[in-house]
């Protein structure tokens, strides 16, 4: 028996106390497991007998039967919603409004940033910045969304005078890897740490004597084991992932921190180069 429907249809016939009970049940249907008739009566300022009579008016033997039936209806309704609403990304479904989607995305990205920053080993980060600053040549590797993060970092490093490459073609990435030398740095960006193309490039770079720095997740992976240094990223994305949104947010926070750290290491000259770069681009407008 669909008691929620019966309550909705019988509203015009309810007395004042019955309307109070109906409103309470509908507003708190998800919390009814912890609600007793005594607790409800006290909260609404009515007698327990009024609640029992309300349940009987709807066709139940008493409040316990009505409460259990409402809990069952609510659970069934939730299951149906979850089954019919398409998961678009993480916790976002096709039933969400744009406002809800915006809040969920914002929170997901905030959590990725907070958790990634909480994991930073700043002494290790400083050492990595020093290693990169001394590298004659820097190669950045990545696939998909990680490649976008890598390309952004490569542009930033070029702007402050570093010799750096970030090729999209995996064959070219492998070719560049085998040309690296001792003192060069390869920055490998892969959240999973298991992409065969990235792992191969890291293997080759290490054999050539280059220093491998991995920006990856905490999960044990081939890339993590190969790297001389790791920078850890955390993402709260689930299996329902349409794009690596919070992963890129976490990765960008790491690469931006690397960039600012490198600027700080040679601040006067770096700022001059950034200014010259800005002046050149202004001339193209």
UniProtKB/Swiss-Prot annotation:
GO terms for biological process: carbohydrate derivative metabolic process; N-acetylmuramic acid catabolic process; negative regulation of DNA-templated transcription; regulation of carbohydrate catabolic process. It holds the Pfam family SIS. Residues 37-56 bind DNA. InterPro entries: Homeodomain-like_sf, HTH_RpiR, RpiR-like, RpiR-like_SIS, SIS_dom, SIS_dom_sf, Tscrpt_reg_HTH_MurR, WH-like_DNA-bd_sf. Keywords: Carbohydrate metabolism, DNA-binding, Repressor, Transcription, Transcription regulation. Gene3D superfamilies: Glucose-6-phosphate isomerase like protein, domain 1, Winged helix-like DNA-binding domain superfamily/Winged helix DNA-binding domain. The keyword DNA-binding applies. GO terms for molecular function: carbohydrate derivative binding; DNA binding; DNA-binding transcription factor activity. Represses the expression of the murPQ operon involved in the uptake and degradation of N-acetylmuramic acid (MurNAc). Binds to two adjacent inverted repeats within the operator region. MurNAc 6-phosphate, the substrate of MurQ, is the specific inducer that weakens binding of MurR to the operator. Homotetramer. This is HTH-type transcriptional regulator MurR. It comes from Escherichia coli O7:K1 (strain IAI39 / ExPEC).
